[in-house]
Amino acid sequence: MSTFVELSTKAKMPIVGLGTWQSPPGQVKEAVKVAIDAGYRHIDCAYAYYNEHEVGEAIQEKIKEKAVRREDLFIVSKLWPTCFERKLLKEAFQKTLTDLKLDYLDLYLIHWPQGLQPGKELFPKDDQGNVLTSKITFLDAWEVMEELVDEGLVKALGVSNFNHFQIERILNKPGLKHKPVTNQVECHPYLTQEKLIEYCHSKGITVTAYSPLGSPNRPWAKPEDPSLLEDPKIKEIAAKHKKTSAQVLIRFHIQRNVVVIPKSVTPARIHENFQVFDFQLSDQEMATILGFNRNWRACLLPETVNMEEYPYDAEY
């Protein structure tokens, strides 16, 4: 079983990466160092996580120790949609690059498709509490991001939380220079994303799954929300393979050729989440897990639900 997916640029993207969303400052640096020691080579970051400087420190320390070379790492970051305007985009990108202490990114994604009004807040609001949108769209941002590729600052571009209509608009954009190589979306057995994955793969676009364990630590979780890690069927499959529920949930994506970025700051779990290449789920087990789908999302971004371009209004 390959530990990489090949992107349309021919670059190899490690199929398991470390997610850093909601990794608290003070813990994320250690988490990245532990991950690199455990064999991870793909680290998923974002401007909006407000922790890239610590991730950068960890990467630098590991490179200095000769534990890893920069060219063996695959570092991803994301542009937040308050920065779609050219000048702000270049500044946001430069901040990411400086914080990560790198001279290039392997992959740069548009974090969310809806353009938001520039400002210090992630969700700029008016006095009534309505989120303020921008007339500058993800297509405008894409052109500026293409320049970053041409300048050698970014190896490839992608999107996150886009539906297939939005991806189609990038693919059909007149004068497109660089196609998106991945769409990073929430994906787990309660949200199997079969149609979106099929669409992306048909266009030569990989899919990256975030919240592969169902985002159990999200701050807005409700007691009645379903829990994947506690699901008896998942536990049963895990016991059969002498693995944990988390390992089964990660393996599920690998066998669909979907890149997966579990987040943890706990050293034992970081190691555990990478021990997923020494077993195989049967076709029957895969079918059982796919049968869990209920189109349930942990991450809805409710702030923007009534705005144009809300990505989850479409079926896929």
Swiss-Prot record:
Cellular compartment(s): Cytoplasm
UniProt keywords, alphabetically: Cytoplasm, NADP, Oxidoreductase
Membrane-traversing stretches: none
Catalytic residues of the enzyme: 49
Function as written in the Swiss-Prot or TrEMBL entry: Reductase with a preference for aliphatic substrates. Can also act on small aromatic aldehydes, steroid aldehydes and some ketone substrates.
Record EC number: 1.1.1.21
Predominant localisation class: cytoplasm
Sites where the protein binds substrate: 111
Similarity-based family: Belongs to the aldo/keto reductase family.
Tissue distribution of the protein: Detected at very low levels in urinary bladder, testis and jejunum.
Protein name listed in UniProt: Aldose reductase-related protein 2
Single GO molecular function: aldose reductase (NADPH) activity
Chain positions of site Lowers pKa of active site Tyr: 78
Source organism superkingdom: Eukaryota
Reactions it catalyzes: an alditol + NAD(+) = an aldose + NADH + H(+); an alditol + NADP(+) = an aldose + NADPH + H(+)
InterPro entries xrefs: AKR (IPR020471), Aldo/ket_reductase_CS (IPR018170), NADP_OxRdtase_dom (IPR023210), NADP_OxRdtase_dom_sf (IPR036812)
GO cellular component terms, semicolon-separated: cytoplasm
Binding locations of NADP(+): 211-273
Subunit: Monomer.
